[in-house]
């Protein structure tokens, strides 16, 4: 007996009902983004692995443990994208879009990470992604955070989230802080997890993000970044908070919220929820002024962005989305199939969704119409074809009509 074929572990089929919810989430998010001037673009799912090595760092968990990377037939190392930002910045540089700044860009699609599958975390998942390239100053950060708030509000999940906010300060602030953090962590070097022992020499701030309980206990008493802000960093953060207050954005300052990559600066944020267990983050982002230069651009481009998990948003509430209700055309007898096909085509030309059922007993075909929640059935038999009219059954009112084609269009459109 042949084994039943299954999808890869951590990769799920999106069936029509799932896709309906995904489509709705994307549509609402795109509409809100357009109010802020965002335009949609897409990048390839496959990139050269070095695109992500440069942007995320070879010592990051994503690159060292989670990326789907392999040699193609030309012996080039390529990777399935684990996130959008690197590809967007690569596209900005390779397409020479510097003269079009500022740019507000929206993307959506699948991303891939080889992680342990669980509720709200799969190996293939889908994201909404927003990047604001050429975003100068705290006012751009505040606008970006308000965009995130408005998206979650439009999707009716904002009330179940908390905006956690922090400032990573400028490069000088982070450099001073990193020295103090290393001094503190060196006293616990032998107790750190194996991953964090490596991070201690390569990127110690990543230890603050560690999921290890042992590491978390150690960093609970570590120095706090805000103690080492320069005056510039303090002013930037204070300005951001002022703008958020003006916009009515509620937030909680989380001094332990960091980004472990060198190109991140100033604003870092996450929208978290208690409704999804351990997978509590549904949207996260930050300012990344240094990334464009790391990716090969001559100048540093100020930028901020965020990504939201579509599957996680979908898990937060049940969306009751109206489906397109089709009209069913049912020919009575084989000699009426050709005419029924023509009628169905003419109805579609008037933007009326139509399904035509030609095989099986009439009772089964009518049952299919009921299963699809059809409001009307159009019967076409010898008499209807001869008289050039249609027999319409209204399934809600349980009434029948004999109408010509133009009157049929009027009835179907007003219903």
Swiss-Prot record:
Its EC number is 6.1.1.21. Homodimer. Keywords: Aminoacyl-tRNA synthetase, ATP-binding, Cytoplasm, Ligase, Nucleotide-binding, Protein biosynthesis. It is an enzyme of class 6 (ligase). Gene3D superfamilies: Anticodon-binding domain, Bira Bifunctional Protein, Domain 2. Disulfide bonds: none annotated. GO terms for cellular component: cytoplasm. The gene is hisS. One of its GO terms (biological process) is histidyl-tRNA aminoacylation. This is Histidine--tRNA ligase.
């Amino acid at each position: 007996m042949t084994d039943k074929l299954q999808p890869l572990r951590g990769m799920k089929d999106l069936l029509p009902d799932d896709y309906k919810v995904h489509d709705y989430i994307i549509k609402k998010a795109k509409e809100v983004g357009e109010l802020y001037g965002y335009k949609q673009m897409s990048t390839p799912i496959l990139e050269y692995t070095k695109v992500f090595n440069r942007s995320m760092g070879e010592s990051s968990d994503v690159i060292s443990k989670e990326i789907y990377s392999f040699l193609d037939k030309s012996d080039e190392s390529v990777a399935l994208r684990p996130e959008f930002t690197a590809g967007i910045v690569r596209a900005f540089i390779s397409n020479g879009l510097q003269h079009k700044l500022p740019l507000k860009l929206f993307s959506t699609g699948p991303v891939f990470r080889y992680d342990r599958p669980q509720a709200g975390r799969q190996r293939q998942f889908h994201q909404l992604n927003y990047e604001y390239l050429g975003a100068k100053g705290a006012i751009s950060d505040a606008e970006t955070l308000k965009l995130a708030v408005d998206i979650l509000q439009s999707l009716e999940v904002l009330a179940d989230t908390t905006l956690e906010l922090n400032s990573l300060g400028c490069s000088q602030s982070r450099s001073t802080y990193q020295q103090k953090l290393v001094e503190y962590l060196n006293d616990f070097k032998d107790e750190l997890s194996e991953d964090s022992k490596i991070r201690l020499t390569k990127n110690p701030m990543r230890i603050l993000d560690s999921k290890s309980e042992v590491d978390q206990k150690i960093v609970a008493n570590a120095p706090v970044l805000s103690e080492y802000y320069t005056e510039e960093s303090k002013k930037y953060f204070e300005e951001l908070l002022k703008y958020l207050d003006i916009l009515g954005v509620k937030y909680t300052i989380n001094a332990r919220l960091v980004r472990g990559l060198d190109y991140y600066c100033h604003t870092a944020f996450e929208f978290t929820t208690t409704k999804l267990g351990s997978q509590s983050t549904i949207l996260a982002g930050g300012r990344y002024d240094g990334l464009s230069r790391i990716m090969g651009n001559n100048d540093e481009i100020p930028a901020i962005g965020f990504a939201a998990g579509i599957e996680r948003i979908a898990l937060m509430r049940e969306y009751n989305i109206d489906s397109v209700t089709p009209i069913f055309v049912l020919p009575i007898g084989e000699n009426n199939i050709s005419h029924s096909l023509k009628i169905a085509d003419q109805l579609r030309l008037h933007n009326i969704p139509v399904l035509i059922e030609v095989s099986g007993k009439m009772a089964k075909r009518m049952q299919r119409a009921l299963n699809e929640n059809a409001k009307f059935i159009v019967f076409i038999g010898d008499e209807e074809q001869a008289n050039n009219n249609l027999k319409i059954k209204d399934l809600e009112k349980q009434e029948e009509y004999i109408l010509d084609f133009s009157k049929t269009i009027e009835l179907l459109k007003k219903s």
